[in-house]
Amino acid sequence: MTQGKNPGLKAGGGKKGAKKRTIDPLSRKEWYDFRAPIPFSSKSFGKTLVTKSSGNRIASEEIKGRVVESTLADLKDNSNDKAWRKVKLVIDEVDGRNAKTSFYGLDITRDRLCSMIRKWQTLIEARVDCKTNDGYIIRVFTLAFTKKTSAGKQSSTSTCYAKSSQVRAIRRKINTFITNEAAKLGIAEFSKNLIGEDYTKKIEKETKNIFPLQNITIRKVKVLKRPKLDATKIAELYSHEKKGEKATGRDGAPEEQAAQNLLAQ
């Protein structure tokens, strides 16, 4: 009987139990810093790993389009009390080892949402699609809760429920206000107002004649469509960075240029 070759044996013969050479997977990767646009702080708020450029593959192109999520406490100074606010950013450009991002949405933590929901009050939810003056189409979700009037506090009842007609009127007021504000502003200024308390205070003032509200919150923001950002627009979003402050890649050169030089050889 002809004995066949064992495909598991190497040509030169191998010793049983020989150790394989281990390669550190991190040696093939490099770190990139996340940078946030206006209205957030210009400092780095996180890092990500990317496989190094090789062949026709450029690492800086692979990282573009990634969506990252952070809290407002990490993105903005003196905002530790807003750690419940989550911010989504998408990477649009890579400058050296800096991954520059732009606004991509808002959300709140689950524990914050649960802490606002209580008994004996009406929860009002509003949703509207609006367009900023620089071409962003976004969907804004707003939460509001009714509160007792001065007359209700003096009465024995513990509830402060709104009628369905009042809920509809409040919802219309909120949606109209958000739509009008978005049409007047660009995404940088509009996102700044959504994160702050300017809009919630104005909504409370405009709806107090219908029914008093409390705990008005921009619960979520989704970016449905955004324009293509060119170099000029990205420079405007990062005008808060100091001039001349630019991270460098390997050997003091931007990573994209080093990869292109490698391909040209």
Curated annotation (Swiss-Prot):
A GO BP annotation: translation
Subcellular location: Cytoplasm
InterPro entries referenced in this protein's UniProt entry, alphabetically: Ribosomal_eS1, Ribosomal_eS1_CS, Ribosomal_eS1_euk
Annotated region described as Disordered, given as residue ranges: 1-24, 240-265
Listed GO MF terms: structural constituent of ribosome
Record Pfam families: Ribosomal_S3Ae
Record's keyword annotation contains Ribonucleoprotein: yes
The family this protein is said to belong to: Belongs to the eukaryotic ribosomal protein eS1 family.
Composition skew (Basic and acidic residues), residue ranges: 240-253
Keywords per UniProt: Cytoplasm, Ribonucleoprotein, Ribosomal protein
GO cellular component, one term: cytosolic small ribosomal subunit
Alphabetized PANTHER family for the sequence: 40S RIBOSOMAL PROTEIN S3A
Subunit-structure text: Component of the small ribosomal subunit. Mature ribosomes consist of a small (40S) and a large (60S) subunit. The 40S subunit contains about 33 different proteins and 1 molecule of RNA (18S). The 60S subunit contains about 49 different proteins and 3 molecules of RNA (25S, 5.8S and 5S).
Designated name of the protein: Small ribosomal subunit protein eS1
